[in-house]
């Protein structure tokens, strides 16, 4: 065991050294005028890069806040991560995602149910903000919270028709405290049911779900939210892999009031 720990430590040290080495090789991906994708260690010319950046920033994904983060984001999925926040209470850890620039975010009810008014949200840039509950739907395990601070990046909600069987999907969250981690899978099934006489639609996926993912978004490659990650199947005596569920985006819309006109009153301070 000791040798394994030492080997892992050496690997991580070398990996971090490589990341911080200015001489480490860079790989660029670009598309030529014929639509052919190329990979090269030589950066494309400035004119091409400028056009590509303008096209990328004109996509439907809305963004507000630190422009530096826009420059750092290399693809749409990285931008998606910037609209995901960690949620901390006295007793739980989970995830939430922003749905408008005012700081309104969706999470699971069970993540904030016992918070007692003490909720902290950790944004992509590492800042910690006070947050408070706006509305809840316990039967659908949903909650709308308000995060203090300025304008935020946010995610658009998709439709249930976007959740076709076999479609590639991603989960962004804070599994085991590893902030803004992403896992990948497919839509395995779409299941309709009832919870305490409340209609509920669950999207089944084989993307990895672990403690801390609760409340995070299940998203398409285009950055549309298909659902809110809620739970994974399993029992203490029967380990189960690759069966997780997210409450559908349609349940988000029907279960919570998502159109507050103004910023809600409450604490508005960073606890960086």
Identify the function of each model-found stretch.
Residues 31-36, 55-98, 255-272:
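N-terminal activation segment of mature serine protease catalytic domains
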